Amino acid sequence: MEEFQVYLELNRSRRHDFLYPLIFREYIYALAHDHGLNKSMIFLENQGYGNKFSSLIVKRLIIRMDQQNHLIISANDSNQNPFFGHKKNLYSQMISAGFAVIVEIPFSLRLVSYSQGEEVAKSHNLQSIHSIFPFLEDKFSHLNYVLDVLIPYPIHLEILVQALRYWVKDASSLHLLRFSLYEYCNLKSFITPKKSISIFNPRLFFFLYNSHACEYESIFLFLRNQSSHLRSTSSGVFLERIYFYGKIDYLVEVFSNDFQNNLWLFKDPFTHFIRYQGKAILASKDTSLLMNKWKYYFVDLWQYYFYMWSQSGRFRINQLSKYSLDFLGYLSSVRLNPSVVRSQMLENSFIIDNAMKKLDTRIPIISLIGSLSKAKFCNTLGHPISKPTWADSSDSDIIDRFVRICRNLSHYHSGSSKKKSLYRIKYILRFSCVKTLARKHKSTVRAFLKRLGSEFLEEFFTETEEEHFFSLIFPRVFFTSRKLYRGRIWYLDIICINALVNHE
């Protein structure tokens, strides 16, 4: 945040959200370059212009924009526009990268003012993406139905631009954004294919998409709060009771006539909504009929108010006790864990059957093996094969690559309740590594293992850094019984691993 305060001397622009002059400042493109140091910035890897960031190209771009009198033109006349010349793609990509930094300034200034102690309007409805993990652990097992939603994309680029009008009250900046979009993007292929999105600056695209998603989410949250007829007091203090929700149903059924005014203490009226990338889930304790109503609410809201075409096939209503939810790279479901308790009372004994709901998170082994098969680590049946493209590397590099992949998968799927599928993935990677080394040394797997021994591959099953960290915190008894390894451990950085989340 300090870099914005140092470089961005907005003065009047700060009060009126007038951001258009910033596109003529060189430090904006320097900030865009700094944002992309660890990621592949498009104009840094542009073919034909070198891979280095050139301040001379930025100066030429600013001079051309400053001298251009008719910058905003229609998309049909873009081919005759002398503004970009033979470097049209490069300049367009640089403008979109700089504009991605500019549109984030109003939001960054709010964070700066909040750090200085100023009052900032807060939203009590929206939470961080990291709240998914406590939701899965605490509340997911107490829900009945889930609505799995594939969020549609806007059918026109103008819808994305209009979403910014409430945040950026600067007509010139919005016109520049339209010009940048229409200059080098085809309207029919920009939104849906991933390769078309790669042409456009990803940072700006996701900012526009999230701004648009914020609009219909605010309306949905208003409808959700209005649909709750009971008081929205949180029941989080009761979640530690094992059979709390079972007691709720009993109390509501038996004492509803006598304690009508106190039922809000026991009911949880909220419907939980989670959005991640292009997917969303709506989970609730309601019946399937009410979930079906929410489905048509979504369809009407998107089609008639946001002009996004959505088919009913993009919605799936599943009962958590019978179906698994494919979300965040896990197959999550709620299973009944039966338990039998024998109670002795004087001379009589009773057998009580209890069924406790428990969260079950499993690894999608079929899709994960399919991903390994596409990467040439195994065949379609899951049998390990050699990796011939890595055979030219040294033995240590080959082992390090396989171990790194294995540990990343273990790190991501540490939240799984069943580790047997993870052991199978480790087996595939382990013997794929052995076959690759044997192929390099022109030997068989049996002869290679007999000559070197199998101890050098124990790195696949040795203690990771995370497990070593937990061994220093938790008592040693947990590790002698290996209970900690069987339990779920959620790491907050797994939401950044898009290759596993979008494995489909």
Swiss-Prot record:
Its main location: plastid. GO terms for biological process: mRNA processing; RNA splicing; tRNA processing. Pfam families: Intron_maturas2, MatK_N. One of its GO terms (molecular function) is RNA binding. Keywords: Chloroplast, mRNA processing, Plastid, RNA-binding, tRNA processing. It is found in: Plastid, Chloroplast. GO terms for cellular component: chloroplast. InterPro entries: Domain_X, Maturase_MatK, Maturase_MatK_N. Belongs to the intron maturase 2 family. MatK subfamily. Usually encoded in the trnK tRNA gene intron. Probably assists in splicing its own and other chloroplast group II introns. This is Maturase K.
